[in-house]
Regions:
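GHKL-family ATP-binding catalytic core of two-component histidine kinases
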Residues: 113-115, 132, 172
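Residue-level recognition of oxygen-bearing side chains
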Residues: 119, 133-136
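Residues lining the SAM
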Residues: 125-128, 154
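A general structural motif
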Residues: 74-75, 146-148
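S-adenosyl-L-methionine-dependent methyltransferase catalytic module, highlighting the catalytic core
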Residues: 135-136, 140, 150-263
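Conserved N-terminal segment of class I S-adenosyl-L-methionine
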Residues: 2-112, 117, 121-125, 238-240, ...
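Active-site micro-motifs of SAM-dependent methyltransferase domains
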Residues: 111, 129, 159
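Helix-to-beta-strand junctions that scaffold the AdoMet/dcAdoMet cofactor pocket
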Residues: 131-132, 145-147
């Protein structure tokens, strides 16, 4: 859980309607005709199943994002892959694949329904690992950003698989920068407080414990850090290694291997 959870509030229908009117008038690419509901503008292809979302997918903004949004109170900020934001903001377009209460626009990954250079800022937090072609999404995000506009993206590096609904790519800092380096000046690259290594350690250890049978879970949870620092090859025959289920090996893998044959 990277950001603090906040109480979610229902969005006033009249307020939502006014915002959707503005989005249609000010931001949409020419010629697009979304399916408009009382809650969002839907650009998904006809027949695309719309599943009831898990309301747990969404957290409040970290302080740097709050400051960015506040600076552009009179403009527009795109939140790409917003999830279910606990605070509904009139200057933030919440784009999602799922109809959360805060969703304004439903759209797929590869082509955004907005005109060129219409957003003052863009944020995408823990999203790009879940898209099949993050490099294509990055190009689209830059396309709809105003010249001189700010884009903030964060992506996991050392995290277990967490599929909402799919998980394709974790990234190093160099990998994340490379998505935008050809079209943007990279002003900073850093590890946020919610991305420090201790979060990796606790998440991996907790999920490792979760995957073990009860007896081995109890044994594993009693190990000291010094025990775990022993060479992995020396621990390979331990029951807490041998009895970890296949799905947890994939979730927490150090390496995965694929064998392919050309059709």
């Amino acid at each position: 859980m990277p950001f603090p959870e906040r109480r979610r509030q229902a969005v006033d229908p009249a307020r939502k309607a006014r915002k959707l009117d503005r989005i249609q008038a000010e931001l949409l690419a020419p010629g697009l005709r979304p399916v408009r509901t009382a809650d969002y503008l839907n650009f998904l292809p006809p027949g695309t199943p719309i599943e009831e979302p898990a309301l747990t997918s969404g957290y409040g903004y970290p302080e740097n994002i709050e400051a960015l949004v506040a600076r552009h109170r009179a403009g527009w900020v795109l939140d790409y892959g917003a999830g279910n934001r606990p605070e509904y903001l009139d200057n933030v377009v919440n784009l999602e694949l799922a109809p959360y209460p805060s969703t304004d626009v439903m759209s797929g990954d590869m082509s955004l329904p907005f005109r060129d250079g219409c957003f003052d800022a863009i944020v995408t937090l823990a999203v790009l690992e879940h898209v099949r072609e993050p490099w294509s999404v990055a190009r689209e995000l830059v396309r709809v950003l105003k010249p001189g506009g700010t884009l903030i993206a964060d992506v996991p590096f050392l995290q277990p698989v967490h599929a909402y609904p799919s998980h394709f790519f974790n990234m190093t800092a160099e990998g994340l920068k490379s998505l935008f380096a050809d079209t943007c000046d990279i002003e900073s690259s850093e590890v946020p407080h919610y991305g420090r290594p201790i979060y990796t350690l606790t998440w991996f250890l907790q999920r490792y414990c979760d995957g073990l049978p009860p007896e081995q879970r109890a044994k594993f949870s009693q190990l000291r850090v010094a025990d775990l620092l022993a060479h992995a090859g020396e621990q390979a025959k331990q029951d807490y290694v041998a009895q970890l289920p296949k799905e947890f090996n994939f979730e927490l893998a150090s390496v995965t291997t694929v064998v392919a044959r050309k059709r």
